[in-house]
Swiss-Prot record:
The keyword Cell cycle applies. This is DNA replication regulator SLD2. It comes from the Eukaryota. Has a role in the initiation of DNA replication. Required at S-phase checkpoint. It is found in: Cytoplasm; Nucleus. PANTHER family: DNA REPLICATION REGULATOR SLD2 (PTHR28124:SF1).
Amino acid sequence: MDMDVQQVKLKIKRWEHAFIAEHNRPPDKDDIRPLTEMKQLYKLYSVLKSKERKAEPIQKQQTPRKDSNMVLGPTPQIYGKAVSIFEMKVSPLKVEETPTTEVEEDIESEIESSVNRRNSDEASANEEKLGIHSVKKRLFESPKKTENTTHLAVPQVTRYGPNSPLKLAQTVSIRQHLLTPKKKKAEPKSLYTPSPLLKRNSSKTLYELAHEHLQYVEEIKELDQQFKSEIVPIRHGNGQDIGDESDEVPEKKKRRTGVLRRLQFDEDENDRTIKKDLHKELLKLKSRKVKEFLGKEDNEPSEEEEEEQQKSEPLPVKKKKPKKYNLVSNNFRRLKLPKKNRNPRFGRRR
């Protein structure tokens, strides 16, 4: 039974729609395998479709080409090569030259005409002297400006400057024949070679460096322990809490806020006694010896009695004299207020 591709496709689509309406999902390979009829239809459809593809030749769709003069667009190209703005034949001061092909054709035509003219008519002696070289020379000469001509004449120049845009043809031909760069030949070595690096045998291994690091860490720990042991413990209350480690706090130096005063220690009883004058004591001893020599009685008190009298007598206490007036100037000194004629260095507030 010969069937068309469209007929096979129609049967397959009808069955698929019926399957979707029944099961609410498209058919899978597992659903097609048990159905031999549908399996054959799928195979037949694939065979017919492959035959159609082979029969129809593939035609590439090409855009029609337009025969137009070459124009440099936003991405300028010339002879199939990308051209930069510095390589384009664009110059505001010069007009484009005539192409070389037209010049060569003009030269050949003029040569042929001159030869025919020489054969047909006997030209004058001046015309006979003119040859091919004279014709070429006359063509390449710069045209002279006439009164009616308004455009600028372009001289025929064979050599161009290094930055001239008219060197495009030369640069393109050079680029087309570039070769891959080759390594240069071995250059002769310099006469003086650098001095070799000295080997340092004193360099340490990783194991030695790690061992030194551990030693440094242990030394730092020992110093920290010594510093902690030197901290003076603060005593609270009676001397019972001296051994507690919790009371050990490092002493902090208090910041000096006021005027420095000398520390006054409590004087002992021995220091509070009046010191004896040596000169007076010597005079007493001399007078006592003289009286003993003369046989006179000494009615003066002894040294022990004098010491007892001195101890019994209380020392005079110095009393502060009351100030006469509570002057306002005291506030200047106490509060360090600025005065008119004082030195600004002293008595400043901190």
